[in-house]
Amino acid sequence: MTGCPFSLIYSAATTMDQLRASGRVTYQGGLMALRVGEEGDRPWVEAKELRGGRLRRFEADRVFLASGAFGTTRLVMGSQDRFDQDMTMQESVQFTLPFVSMRPTVDPRTEQLFTLNQFNMVVRLDEQGRDLSQLHFYTYNPAFSAALPGGLRWQGARFLTTAVLQRLSFAIGYLPSWVSPRLRLRARPSRPGEVTELRVWREDPRWHRNRTLRRVLSRVARASAPLDLWPVLPELHFAAGGKSYHWGSSFPHSTRASSTSTDTLGRTDRWRRVHLVDASVFPDVPATTFTLTIMANAHRIATGALAEAW
């Protein structure tokens, strides 16, 4: 897939541009954060200029880390010298599954479409709605044509190619992290002025033993006739570990902070004024989209931090 079209969905860059224009924030661009820490009650950030490589140090009353679960985890592990120690991260594993329909649509290559998914399917596996699997459906993308067998890309097979594309859709699905294999992380020291090295690998997935996956595929298959969406099960594939973009829980919230968990304000046991505010602090990762949940939790942490005595 070729990604999301520019400006059709919300981007935090839009809000940031508005804040910069109003003078409410000062944006420091062209920098890469290398380390964070605290000296007394004063947190600091060491960053490197991407042009020239000069190191700079910033101090503040509070530091909020929102580099994405992987970026924040790497930054924290490197800053706390947690090298050659295995850590875990939860992932909502991603799978891809093509579908065919009996009834054709118009030729999708002639439609004014965008590369966002056209519709979603949610498979509920319990009465509470906690165990969910979500599938995002895409009806056409230039990648479809490029992935067709060679015979269907032949100029003389245009009629057959059109017939296939009129009936083909493609789903990207997710399983919740509590039934997905976990990711393993290990940090290695880097040279001075360089970002911490981070090795990532996945536990043995053992898909054939995944009961939740079998239930999801069974539910999807049972809905095939009324929806006219027939899954091509032999073409089920799983993304490599860490490729789902649905990960977190490397420093999950807990009632008491530790070296591997954070308190309800996103602080490990070593820090009082450095707060983790992205998905790295989630207790687990759902199969549904969770960007708004990340934003709401970050807002809650920032509000709580501001309410504390400075």
Which role does the model predict for each range below?
Residues 1-61:
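Helical element adjacent to the flavin cofactor pocket in flavoenzyme catalytic cores
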Residues 47, 54, 61-177:
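Mid-to-C-terminal "cap/lid" subdomains and adjacent gly/pro-rich loops that border
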Residues 284-305:
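A conserved FAD-binding loop/helix module that cradles the flavin
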Residues 28, 34-37, 212-284, 291:
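A glycine-rich dinucleotide-binding beta-alpha-beta segment and adjacent secondary-structure elements
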Residues 3-7, 84-87, 286-289:
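Alpha-helix capping and helix-loop boundary segments enriched in small/acidic/polar residues
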Residues 149-224, 230:
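C-terminal catalytic lobe of FAD-dependent flavoproteins
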Residues 80, 217-222, 298-310:
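Internal hydrophobic alpha-helix adjacent to the cofactor/substrate pocket in enzyme cavities
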Residues 86-96, 105, 239-246, 304-310:
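Active-site-proximal substrate-binding core of FAD-dependent oxidoreductases
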